[in-house]
């Protein structure tokens, strides 16, 4: 069965639902890694820091975060090389998403319970993100800043809320 549209889970309308001790059957996170590029270097080793910020509070599902991570990381790997940047995914999908499955087709009314006991079963996880919070950060050299911006633009296209790309460190180096 395919995933429901992300618009079902985007709004922060329900209380946080994160206690994995009490919930069984939670699907695993699709996010493979949170730190990419040259893992031996720190953020202080790079003159430029560029981040992708979300402009409104929302929930982003783990599949969307992973596809955004893959596209940004692949762009950086191909054009810059693994040793010349560091990329960090700053959010972890703690929020458990539930869905009340509905039977469809012939005889569904006899099989389905409708809205009786409609709490729902876990179908995935999402990260809760507040307004103007950073999701991805790329640390790179001055020459690679345009590639980093392009990678974050590709990541932005994989997520539904409006985003912006901020140069947080090294703005003066990029202008000159």
Swiss-Prot record:
InterPro entries named in the record: Ribosomal_uL16 (IPR047873), Ribosomal_uL16_arc (IPR022981), Ribosomal_uL16_CS_euk_arc (IPR018255), Ribosomal_uL16_dom (IPR016180), Ribosomal_uL16_euk_arch (IPR001197), Ribosomal_uL16_sf (IPR036920)
Keywords of the record: Ribonucleoprotein, Ribosomal protein
SUPFAM superfamilies linked to this entry: Ribosomal protein L16p/L10e (SSF54686)
GO MF annotation, one: structural constituent of ribosome
Pfam families: Ribosomal_L16
GO cellular component, one term: ribosome
Single biological process term from Gene Ontology: translation
Matching Gene3D superfamilies: Ribosomal protein L10e/L16
Family: Belongs to the universal ribosomal protein uL16 family.
Name of the protein in question: Large ribosomal subunit protein uL16
Gene name tied to this protein: rpl10e
């Amino acid at each position: 069965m395919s995933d429901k549209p992300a618009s079902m889970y985007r709004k922060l309308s329900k209380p946080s639902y994160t206690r994995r001790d009490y919930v069984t059957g939670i699907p695993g996170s699709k996010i493979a890694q949170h730190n990419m590029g040259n893992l031996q270097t720190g953020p202080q080793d790079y003159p430029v820091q560029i981040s992708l910020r979300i402009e409104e509070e929302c929930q982003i599902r783990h599949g969307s975060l992973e596809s955004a991570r893959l596209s940004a990381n692949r762009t950086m790997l191909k054009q810059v090389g693994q040793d010349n940047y560091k990329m960090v995914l700053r959010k972890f999908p703690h929020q458990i998403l539930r869905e009340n499955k509905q039977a469809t087709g012939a005889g569904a009314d006899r099989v389905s319970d409708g809205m009786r006991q409609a709490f729902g079963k876990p179908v995935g996880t999402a990260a809760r993100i507040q307004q103007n919070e950073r999701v991805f950060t790329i640390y790179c050299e001055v020459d690679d800043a345009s590639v980093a911006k392009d990678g974050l633009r590709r990541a932005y296209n994989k997520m539904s809320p409006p985003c912006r790309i901020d140069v947080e460190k090294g703005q003066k180096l990029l202008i000159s």
